[in-house]
């Protein structure tokens, strides 16, 4: 598997960004992404930094029913994201 997922020119994802059982994945690099309405991450056992999703939570593009995270290295709830807990406490 790969540890980084990079889409430098991606601007919009219609729907949710989904990833399942990518055990080595630690980061997403999508600097131009402006549109995203959900996250579905299951069993990303090395992934723990969800700060890339902060703008989509803050402007309500991603709503609670569309925030699905389980079995990852860190599993923030939707409320955790609202509270700014994008990665595990150090």
Which ranges hold each PLM region?
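Concave beta-strand-loop units of leucine-rich repeat
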Residues: 1-89
């Amino acid at each position: 598997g790969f540890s980084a997922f990079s889409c430098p020119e991606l601007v919009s994802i219609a729907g949710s960004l989904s990833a399942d059982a990518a055990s080595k994945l630690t980061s997403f690099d999508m600097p131009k992404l402006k549109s995203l309405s959900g996250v579905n991450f299951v069993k990303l056992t090395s992934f723990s930094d969800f700060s890339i999703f902060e703008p989509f939570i803050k402007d309500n593009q991603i709503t609670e029913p569309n925030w699905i995270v389980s079995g990852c290295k860190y599993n923030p709830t939707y409320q955790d994201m609202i509270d700014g807990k994008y990665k595990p406490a150090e």
